Amino acid sequence: MIITIAHTKGGVGKSTLAWHLAHSFENKQVKIIDLDFQQTLYFVNIISGDTLNVLQPLSVDELINELEAVAPDDICIVDVGGFDSDINRAAIEHSDRIVIPISESITEVLGFRTFEGILKELKVDAEIHVVLNNIHPLTKNFDIIKEAVSKNKMKLLNTVVRSRKIFRTAMGEGSHIFKVADHLQAKQEILGVRDELRCNQ
């Protein structure tokens, strides 16, 4: 299964979500394709001791070859950069699941609408899911996001991933949320995203 974490806006937490989500799968072969020009996941994986297979295809053809090699029972998570490009569009078009991280701010909604336009241009057969990500712990009202998503053929996940220091700290140390003690709620949030995507069966 190919899961693409996508948004044309940078700073929405795509790489952080992709990294922790990749470590949530049990008894699965998991690889990451890092298309972000910042190469965040590539370098975090080096710090971790190369615990995952992180690839950086340099062309559309190379990317497609990697995606076509993904077995049905394996997991491939694609972290696209915060910009529009041919290689990012190819990743989206070859996905089984597209996950769009978004926060509650009005600027995020505007960025979401821009990305929505790109999706309409592409031939996308994948399920498209929106996840409230990097959300302030006290925020409860998501009406703006719900309204934006309701106008599209997308599903807003019930799981809300809150802004948590441990997500960033663990990642910065080359670790992940499932390797640290405690922080049960943070772990449940990542598992909630995984389970709602129905890709650990």
Question: Model segments located where?
Answer:
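P-loop/Walker-type NTP enzyme "switch/lid" segment
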Residues: 2-12, 19, 23-86, 171-175, ...
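Structural beta-sheet core signal
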Residues: 32, 78, 100, 130-132
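Inter-motif core of Ras-like GTPase G domains
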Residues: 86-105
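Short, conserved loop/helix-junction motifs that constitute active-site signature segments
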Residues: 94, 120-125, 149-150
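Conserved C-terminal guanine-recognition region of P-loop GTPase G domains, centered on the G4
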Residues: 110-125, 133
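Beta-strand-loop-alpha "switch" segments that mediate conformational coupling across diverse proteins
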Residues: 136, 147-176
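Inter-lobe coupling/hinge region of RecA-like P-loop helicase motors
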Residues: 168-187, 191-194
